[in-house]
A protein has these predicted regions:
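Short glycine/serine/threonine-rich phosphate/pyrophosphate-binding segments
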Residues: 2, 38, 60-66
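Structural motif
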Residues: 51-55, 74-76, 93-97
Length: 198
């Protein structure tokens, strides 16, 4: 993760952008899943605390779905520079999801063929590796709840999901600093303060 943040800071500095690392910074940091990342991104973007969010998870797919579950978040999936360019130029979204564990390499034509073969073969939702199945299925169920709740007014959506999810998402010191220093939507700021008991 340090290498990712280093490269993001370098690229952003060239363009005159400021970077806030509000996610995890290591295994001993404030614990966030891709579900929490979606909540954080939605709060930051809808409150206009930031203009763009870079997120991710092991494969990048969970973060992509979690961010896109929320109104006001338009997240693309990026595994190579062409993806980032086309997303920025064609889709003009406000978030990217990156795979932080899964690699991508030579033989793109073979890779895409295997992607399609694997996507349509066998029963879906079985988890991988097997020992992570339960947590993956739990997170998939939670994400479905989040999407259902988020399909309402933004704050009504936040209020309709498990409050513990939101409290965990906003509990990190770096998130709070970036959010409270930059948020421009008073209603969303008041909601987050209420969640934090302020």
């Amino acid at each position: 993760m340090a290498l990712t943040l280093e490269q993001l800071n370098t690229a952003a500095a060239v363009q005159g952008h400021e970077v806030f690392n509000v996610g995890m910074d290591g295994d001993n940091d404030h614990r966030l899943t891709y579900i929490h990342l979606g909540i954080c991104a939605a709060l930051l973007l809808n409150a206009r605390a930031v203009d763009f969010v870079v997120a991710g998870c092991g494969t990048g797919q969970g973060a992509l779905m979690s961010l896109n579950a929320w109104p006001g978040v338009y997240c693309g999936y990026c595994i190579e520079p062409t993806d980032a360019f086309l997303f920025a130029q064609v889709n003009n979204g406000n978030a990217l999801s990156l795979p932080f564990a899964k690699g991508y390499g030579w033989g793109a034509e073979i890779n895409i063929r295997y992607i399609f073969e694997k996507a349509f073969a066998g029963e879906r939702g079985q988890g991988y590796p097997a020992e992570r199945r339960e947590s993956q299925m739990t997170n998939a169920g939670i994400l479905a709840q989040v999407k259902q709740g988020a399909s309402k007014d933004f704050i009504a959506g936040l209020k309709s999901i498990d409050p513990a999810l939101v409290k965990q998402a906003v509990g990190g010191a770096r998130f709070q600093q970036a959010f409270f220093d930059n948020a421009q939507d008073a209603e969303i700021v008041a909601y987050v303060k209420g969640v934090l008991g302020q």
